[in-house]
């Protein structure tokens, strides 16, 4: 930005930079709060470039034009504890839990779209918390995550999953509690002249034409897209969250040049 302003100080418009340390997981006090503040101020943002590490292995491979939604579910089934020798006096919650998990895992939500992978559910935890081998537990819990495309909303998916939980719990005469947390809804920024301008700049500098993609996890674009169209492009994410996380200095220099050229072309 400083390089751009130094060379093009008479450009028409404004540039804002947002850096946050609260962008993983629930992300309460970072971009989300800033977006809420900007909405209250009725601030108009024309475009946003998010500096996520979008490239799998080489700089220039990928631009993110959207993201899948992400929703976690925590399910607790309550039965009746008892001795394994007298199952008629108990109600094993793990029976209902296993049946529910199998049925929701087997749901074919969709076949994907031209922009998104198929919606997918993964079971992430199963906990019966029973230290005795001869006791039927009183409760059992599990958590699952759904990564979903823009054919669904978190609300529609909750309804679909809840039907299965309700049906199998009733069949097994078990009580249940289901809690959901939504990290973000699926969204897509339709490619336009800005998208293709950025794609051309990246190709010119890296000699690679970047793929327009929606793969991967969530990012802060999930908040920004509520107030502005946005794309994501940054460094290579090959070592992110690993021991000895690192980036190439050569890539860093190229990325600086890419960003500088994007600003130059955007404000033409």
Model segments located where?
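Acidic/histidine-rich catalytic neighborhood of metal-dependent amide-processing enzymes
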Residues: 1-66
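Metal-dependent amide/peptide-bond hydrolase catalytic core
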Residues: 53-58, 65, 71-268
């Amino acid at each position: 930005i400083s390089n751009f302003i130094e060379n093009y100080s008479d450009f028409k418009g404004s540039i804002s930079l947002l850096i946050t340390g609260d962008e993983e997981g629930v992300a309460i006090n970072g971009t989300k709060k800033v977006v809420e503040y900007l909405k209250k101020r009725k601030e108009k943002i024309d475009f946003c470039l998010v500096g996520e590490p979008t490239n799998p292995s080489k700089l220039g491979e990928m631009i993110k034009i959207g993201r899948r939604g992400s929703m976690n579910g925590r399910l607790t089934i309550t039965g009746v504890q008892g001795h394994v020798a007298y199952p008629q006096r108990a109600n094993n919650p793990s029976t209902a839990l296993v049946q529910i998990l199998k049925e929701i895992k087997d749901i074919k939500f969709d076949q994907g779209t031209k922009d998104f992978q198929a919606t997918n559910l993964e079971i992430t935890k199963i906990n019966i918390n029973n230290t005795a081998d001869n006791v039927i537990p009183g409760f059992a819990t599990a958590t699952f995550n759904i990564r979903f495309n823009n054919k669904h909303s978190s609300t529609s998916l909750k309804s679909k999953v809840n039907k299965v939980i309700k049906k199998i719990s009733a069949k097994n005469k078990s009580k249940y509690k289901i809690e959901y947390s939504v990290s973000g809804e699926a969204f897509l920024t339709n490619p336009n002249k800005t998208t293709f301008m950025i794609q051309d700049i990246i190709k010119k500098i890296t000699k690679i034409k970047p793929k327009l993609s929606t793969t991967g996890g969530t990012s802060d674009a999930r908040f920004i897209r509520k107030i502005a169209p946005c794309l994501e492009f940054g460094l290579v994410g090959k070592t992110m969250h690993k021991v000895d996380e690192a980036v190439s200095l050569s890539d860093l220099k190229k990325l600086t040049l890419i960003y500088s050229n994007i600003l130059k072309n955007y404000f033409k």
